[in-house]
A protein has these predicted regions:
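Tryptophan-centered short beta-strand motifs
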Residues: 3, 74-76, 189, 264
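Noncatalytic modules at the cell exterior or secretory-pathway interfaces
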Residues: 48-52, 87-105
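Enriched but not universal
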Residues: 1-53, 266-271
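Short proline/glycine-enriched turn/loop motifs at strand-loop junctions of beta-rich domains
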Residues: 45, 55-63, 239
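Short beta-strand segments and strand-loop junctions that repeat across beta-rich extracellular domains
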Residues: 53, 62-76, 98, 248-261
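Structural signature of tandem-repeat unit edges
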Residues: 37-43, 81-89, 97-99, 109-148, ...
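Periodically patterned hydrophobic/aromatic "hotspot" residues that form packing/interaction faces
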Residues: 6-10, 19, 152, 156, ...
Length: 271
């Protein structure tokens, strides 16, 4: 019998509301979150700001998204290439900020639309809420077509506030440059999202975690990394030691910044 088998408990004829084993609550238990059913979310760890800004380019390539802080209503914001007028969200520790949008890509070649700011946070939830808006629940892949490139390129570029991204749910496929520089120079990032895509296309992960100097955990289930530049410098200048979890059938990872960092422990995933 497991905790989930318990539907009710009694002490004599009196109902029991909680059961402890020592000091640990063993019933009722809270089921783990289903991160795929949650929009992209930041759990705030320190007071500060979240800024939605454009890095380079002109106002013609800005992007509009929506955010919700705690139980407030959804609010639309549009990125700006001018930092002084870029939308800014003030946050405190414990705040929950969620995001959604309907943009196929957040990098137009000449510009990147990025999250920056001064707060520290953990990120989790379904990244596809930024592409499919309210309809992300039934989607598991990036859109196809010629305009579906650079989807999340540079999205967290140089964001020093993001600490743990391991519970961001990523798509099952890749597109050209889809995650190029996505976490570039995120100097305090420790854990990367699980990367489920089997086949990497041209430049898909190029410089994805370049100069994430504290990054020490990566789980990548790719089995085909033959495309040009698909992992070029993707793990350049990360932590000196760490853990790399790979697909058990994948035996062709190179060693170094374009593959598995030297001196990292390699583990086969359970698939």
């Amino acid at each position: 019998m497991t905790n989930s088998d318990i539907t009710a408990a009694y002490y004599g004829v009196d109902p029991v509301s909680k059961i402890y084993l020592g000091g640990e609550l063993v019933w009722p238990t809270t089921p783990p979150p289903v991160y795929s059913a949650i929009p992209l979310t930041f759990k705030i760890l320190s007071a500060g700001t979240i800024m939605w800004r454009q890095n380079g380019g002109s106002t013609s390539t800005t992007k509009t998204i929506q955010y919700k802080k705690n139980d407030d209503a959804w609010v639309s914001i549009t990125s700006s290439p001018t930092v002084s007028v870029a939308p800014t969200i003030s946050v405190q520790p414990g705040d929950i900020v969620q995001f959604k949008g309907t943009n196929i890509r957040y990098n137009n070649g000449s510009s990147q639309n990025i999250f920056s700011g001064t707060c520290s946070f953990n990120a989790y939830g379904n990244i596809l809420s930024l592409i499919y808006g309210d309809n992300y629940l039934n989607e598991t892949e990036l859109p196809s077509g010629n305009t579906s490139t650079k989807n999340f390129s540079g999205l967290f570029k140089q964001n020093m506030g993001i600490i743990d991204a391991s519970n961001i749910i990523m798509p099952q496929n890749t597109t050209w440059y889809c995650y190029e520089e996505m976490f570039y120079y995120c100097g305090n990032l420790v854990k990367a999202p699980t990367l489920p895509a089997a086949t990497l296309v041209y430049a898909a992960y190029q410089q994805m975690f370049d100069n994430c100097k504290k990054l020490n955990y990566v789980k990548c289930l790719a089995t085909n990394i033959s495309a040009t530049d698909c992992t070029s410098s993707w793990l350049n200048q990360v932590a000196a030691t760490g853990t790399f979890v790979k697909h058990p059938n994948m035996t062709s990872w190179p060693s170094g910044k374009d593959g598995i960092p030297r001196n990292w422990t390699v583990i086969d995933a359970t698939v």
